[in-house]
């Protein structure tokens, strides 16, 4: 992989990470468009890009993260502890679905040739587009707070 390709892929990752689209999917598409061999760099390169994204997110949101961490160690139950608990609660369905579907998805991806993976990524991006369209036209809910049920 050439340096310019790595820079372009980093820009794609940075631009798409905070949009309601799949940054990993766009990364795969960008690799294909740039003619980058998926095996070159592979998982290490993708992990490096995502680690850089996490680091930049921590830098940007440092004051909020610091407030939550300090609030976690309060002796009395407070808003920060409730918020962190809701974040953890919101991860439970994703973990369950992820661990349940992981063997199936792993075998699916391993059996697909490169163009098949690209087709899968494209299909998932279309599914995301449909879900975002439904969310856009759905009746908005105006809630001041997130309940534990909403978090789950």
What is each PLM-predicted segment?
Residues 1-152:
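Multi-pass membrane proteins that catalyze or facilitate reactions on polyprenyl-/lipid-phosphate substrates
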């Amino acid at each position: 992989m050439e340096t310019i390709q790595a820079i372009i892929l980093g820009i794609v990752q940075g631009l798409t990470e905070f949009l309601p689209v799949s940054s990993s999917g766009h990364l795969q598409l960008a690799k294909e468009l740039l003619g980058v061999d998926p095996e070159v760099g592979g998982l290490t390169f993708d992990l490096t890009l995502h680690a850089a994204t996490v680091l930049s997110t921590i830098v940007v949101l440092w004051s909020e993260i610091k407030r939550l961490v300090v609030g976690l160690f309060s002796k009395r139950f407070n808003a920060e502890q409730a918020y962190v608990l809701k974040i953890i609660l919101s991860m439970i369905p994703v973990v369950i679905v992820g661990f349940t579907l992981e063997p199936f998805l792993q075998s699916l991806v391993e059996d697909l040739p490169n163009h098949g993976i690209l087709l899968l990524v494209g299909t998932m991006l279309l599914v995301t587009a449909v879900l975002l369209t439904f969310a856009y036209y759905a009746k908005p809910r105006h809630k001041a707070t997130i309940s534990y049920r909403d978090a789950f």
